[in-house]
A protein has these predicted regions:
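Positively charged n-region of N-terminal signal peptides that target proteins for export
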Residues: 1-4
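Classic N-terminal secretory signal peptides
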Residues: 7-12
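N-terminal signal peptide c-region/cleavage motif recognized by signal peptidases
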Residues: 15-17
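Long, low-complexity serine/threonine/glycine- and acidic-rich segments characteristic of extracellular
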Residues: 30-35, 48, 52-62, 70-148
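Proline-enriched interdomain boundary motifs that mark the N-terminal boundary
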Residues: 37-42
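Periplasmic peptidoglycan-binding/anchoring modules of Gram-negative envelope and division proteins
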Residues: 65
Length: 148
């Protein structure tokens, strides 16, 4: 009897976990279609640059409008800077806000970031008002900088 009760609880737990995952995916806003020829780039620093710990990063965008996250107009969005990210964030959820994913929801096109000495990678990821990546994602080339 105890085995049946444990199996029943395990089954209910697994079903609940699957339902929670399905609900989270269903709740994610749809991804906006990428405007034709939209690109983003890191204008400064250049790939391979040797920089101090306070790094001015300038963002570029072409064929898409940079706007605050409150602007929900089609074809607009804002930058996210990925710092030392191994891969892009999941496409079915908003870009997280943490030390690896910096949000620029006020429509900023540059920032000074502080990095510890060593090699670091930087990449831009452009998203809509809901912090969802476009479809397909609008990302810059990943660059590596050397911090003194």
């Amino acid at each position: 009897m105890r085995t049946i009760a444990l199996l029943t609880l395990a089954t209910l737990f697994a079903a609940g976990a699957a339902s929670a995952q399905d609900a989270a995916k269903a709740a994610a806003p749809p991804r906006a279609k990428t405007p034709p020829h939209a690109t983003v780039s890191i204008l400064e620093p250049k790939n391979g640059a040797h920089v101090g710990q306070d790094v001015l990063v300038k963002f570029g965008a072409k064929n898409i409008s940079v706007a605050p996250a409150t602007d929900t107009a089609p074809g607009t969005g804002h930058h996210h800077l990925l710092i030392d990210a191994k891969e892009l964030p999941p496409l079915d959820a908003p870009i997280p806000a943490d030390a690896t994913h910096k949000h620029y929801g006020k429509g900023q096109t540059q920032d000074t970031i502080h990095l510890e000495p060593g090699d670091h990678t930087l990449q831009l990821d452009f998203a809509d008002a809901a912090h969802m990546q476009f479809n397909p994602p609008i990302v810059s080339k990943k660059i590596t900088i050397h911090v003194k």
